[in-house]
Amino acid sequence: MKTLLLTLVVVTIVCLDLAYTRKCYKTHPYKSEPCAPGENLCYTKTWCDFRCSQLGKAVELGCAATCPTTKPYEEVTCCSTDDCNRFPNWERPRPRPRGLLSSIMDHP
């Protein structure tokens, strides 16, 4: 009887995933997905590229074992709870007016 009980316990442990897997938002496509084993941090990386003035900052979301290092023009935030790296909610830059009126507005 003890052998049967021990066998059931071992089978249960093998079949169940007892290790917790962090879930983070990832880009391309933007959705929440489980992270790979050992990756327990979510990160949000933002930077300006050539489209920054029209579309706003570029954004990369993902999982990491350690918080990614940044380049001088990048900003990175890391967090350690499920889905804590939502897409940043900021206003897109407004296009500047063009034409004669814009030159008047530029010099009040």
Curated annotation (Swiss-Prot):
Gene3D superfamilies assigned: CD59
Pfam families for the chain: Toxin_cobra-type
Alphabetized UniProt keyword annotations: Acetylcholine receptor inhibiting toxin, Disulfide bond, Ion channel impairing toxin, Neurotoxin, Postsynaptic neurotoxin, Secreted, Signal, Toxin
Cysteine pairs bridged by disulfides in the record: 24-42, 35-63, 48-52, 67-78, 79-84
UniProt xrefs under PROSITE patterns: SNAKE_TOXIN (PS00272)
GO MF annotation list: acetylcholine receptor inhibitor activity; ion channel regulator activity; toxin activity
Superkingdom classification of source: Eukaryota
Position of the signal peptide: 1-21
Gene Ontology CC terms: extracellular region
Tissue: Expressed by the venom gland.
Record localization: Secreted
Family that this chain belongs to: Belongs to the three-finger toxin family. Long-chain subfamily. Type II alpha-neurotoxin sub-subfamily.
Function text: Binds with high affinity to muscular (alpha-1/CHRNA1) and neuronal (alpha-7/CHRNA7) nicotinic acetylcholine receptor (nAChR) and inhibits acetylcholine from binding to the receptor, thereby impairing neuromuscular and neuronal transmission.
Name of this chain's protein: Long neurotoxin 43
Organism the protein comes from: Drysdalia coronoides
